[in-house]
């Protein structure tokens, strides 16, 4: 028996969120969390969780097509706009083992969130709280304590080592923090 949301989502990763309805035939806008289109374009069976309603369900993708910076998704059995509205705001999860393998210097955000961040001298700076996509490069948000954050660009100038397996990142402290 599943007792907690953590158990329910164990082994799964959020890859998108369902936005507003599209048209009158039960379609929804799908906004990816990933820059790997093959992940989204290969969706078949998905897990949906809506944080507001606390509803979790399994759905089958009937149709998916690319629009302007987002996708239009049609779920099997959702035939009209009224039914589709129930899914707005739901996160789309897949099993982690469905993700494509990455090269050594690539990472999925979930692999580095929670990593300990250490400077060159061995001083612990904090823990990665989130990863922000800026367009030119990713930026890790390092939670120093409950009130202070450090933003570090994920570029070779600042990242010395990024060890996904051991959740440890060694960084060169940015000059603006000295």
UniProtKB/Swiss-Prot annotation:
Pfam families per the UniProt record, alphabetical: PRC_RimM (PF24986), RimM (PF01782)
Protein name, as recorded: Ribosome maturation factor RimM
Signal peptide region: none
InterPro entries from the UniProt entry: PRC_barrel-like_sf (IPR011033), PRC_RimM (IPR056792), RimM (IPR011961), RimM_N (IPR002676), RimM_N_sf (IPR036976), Transl_B-barrel_sf (IPR009000)
First-listed, main subcellular location of the protein, grouped into a coarse class: cytoplasm
A biological process from GO: rRNA processing
Subcellular location per the Swiss-Prot or TrEMBL entry: Cytoplasm
PRC barrel domain: residues covered: 103-177
General function of this protein: An accessory protein needed during the final step in the assembly of 30S ribosomal subunit, possibly for assembly of the head region. Essential for efficient processing of 16S rRNA. May be needed both before and after RbfA during the maturation of 16S rRNA. It has affinity for free ribosomal 30S subunits but not for 70S ribosomes.
Family: Belongs to the RimM family.
Gene Ontology molecular function, alphabetical: ribosome binding
Domain of life from the UniProt record: Bacteria
GO cellular component, one term: ribosome
Species in which this protein is naturally found: Thermosipho africanus (strain TCF52B)
Keywords recorded for this protein, A-Z: Chaperone, Cytoplasm, Ribosome biogenesis, rRNA processing
HAMAP family (UniProt xref): Ribosome_mat_RimM
């Amino acid at each position: 028996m599943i007792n907690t949301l953590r158990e329910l989502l164990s082994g799964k990763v959020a890859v998108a969120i369902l936005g507003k309805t599209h048209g009158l035939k039960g379609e929804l806008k799908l906004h990816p969390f990933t820059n790997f289109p093959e992940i989204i374009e290969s969706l078949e069976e998905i897990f949906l969780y809506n944080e507001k309603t606390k509803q979790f369900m399994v759905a089958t993708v009937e149709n998916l097509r690319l629009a302007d910076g987002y996708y239009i998704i049609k779920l099997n059995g959702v035939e009209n706009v009224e039914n589709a509205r129930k899914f707005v705001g739901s996160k789309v999860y897949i099993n982690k083992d469905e993700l494509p393998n990455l090269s050594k210097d690539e990472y999925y955000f979930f692999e580095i969130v929670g990593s300990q961040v250490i400077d060159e001298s061995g001083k612990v700076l904090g823990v990665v709280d989130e990863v922000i996509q800026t367009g030119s490069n990713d930026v890790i948000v390092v939670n120093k304590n409950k009130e202070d954050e450090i933003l570090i660009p994920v570029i070779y100038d600042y990242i010395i080592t990024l060890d996904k397996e051991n959740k440890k990142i060694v960084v060169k402290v940015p000059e603006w923090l000295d």
